[in-house]
C-alpha cells in the first residue's frame, strides 16, 4: 500500500515527463546522507506541491524580462519607472508568453541550491529561530516568490538586502510572551 505522499510524489514525477530525471536527482542527492533527512523531506514537499504551478518561457518572456530589468535598474525616478513598466506590460500581455508546468522544466541544480540556501537562512537567521519545519516549508522553502517567476537566483540577490532588514527582528519571539499568545 502506497502512502498519500508517495502517490502525490509519483504523480508529479509522471507529470514531469522528460524532466522526471531532474526531480529524481534531487531526491537521490538528499537520500545519500542521513544528516540530510530533513532536506529530503523538504525536497519531497516541494516536488509534491509543484503541480498547478507554472512558469513562463520563450523568447517573448526573455525579451520582457530583459526590458523590465533595464527599467528597474535605470537611474530614473520611481514614477518614471512605474510608467515605463506599465507601458511594457501593455506591450507584452501574458497571453504572448508560453506557460509550462514547473515540474517539466525545473532543474535539479536549481532546486538543490534553493533548498540549501533556504535551510541556511532558517537555521542561521536569528529572525527564523521560532519557525517550525511546517512553517519553514510553507513560507521560507518555496523556490520562487510569485507564480510564473523565472527560475533565477532571487535568493542570492535578495539575501543581503533581506538579512540587513531582518536583523531588526532578532527578538521576534516577544509576541508569544504577550496576552495575545495566551
Regions found by a protein language model. Give the residues of each.
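N-terminal accessory/pre-domain segments preceding catalytic cores
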Residues: 1-181
Amino acid at each position: 500500500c502506497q502512502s498519500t505522499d508517495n502517490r502525490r510524489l509519483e504523480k508529479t514525477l509522471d507529470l514531469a515527463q522528460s524532466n522526471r530525471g531532474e526531480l529524481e536527482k534531487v531526491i537521490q542527492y538528499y537520500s545519500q546522507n542521513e544528516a540530510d533527512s530533513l532536506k529530503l523531506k523538504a525536497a519531497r514537499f516541494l516536488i509534491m506541491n509543484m503541480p498547478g504551478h507554472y512558469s513562463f518561457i520563450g523568447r517573448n518572456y526573455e525579451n520582457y524580462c530583459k526590458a523590465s530589468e533595464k527599467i528597474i535598474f535605470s537611474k530614473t525616478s520611481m514614477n518614471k519607472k512605474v510608467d515605463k513598466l506599465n507601458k511594457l506590460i501593455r506591450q507584452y500581455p501574458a497571453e504572448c508568453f508560453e506557460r509550462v508546468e514547473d515540474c517539466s522544466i525545473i532543474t535539479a541544480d536549481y532546486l538543490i541550491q534553493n533548498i540549501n540556501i533556504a535551510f541556511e537562512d532558517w537555521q542561521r537567521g536569528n529572525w527564523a529561530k521560532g519557525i517550525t519545519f511546517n512553517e519553514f516549508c510553507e513560507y521560507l522553502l518555496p523556490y520562487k516568490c510569485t507564480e510564473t517567476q523565472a527560475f533565477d537566483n532571487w535568493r542570492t540577490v535578495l539575501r543581503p538586502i533581506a538579512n540587513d532588514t531582518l536583523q531588526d527582528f532578532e527578538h521576534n519571539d516577544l509576541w508569544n510572551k504577550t496576552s495575545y499568545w495566551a
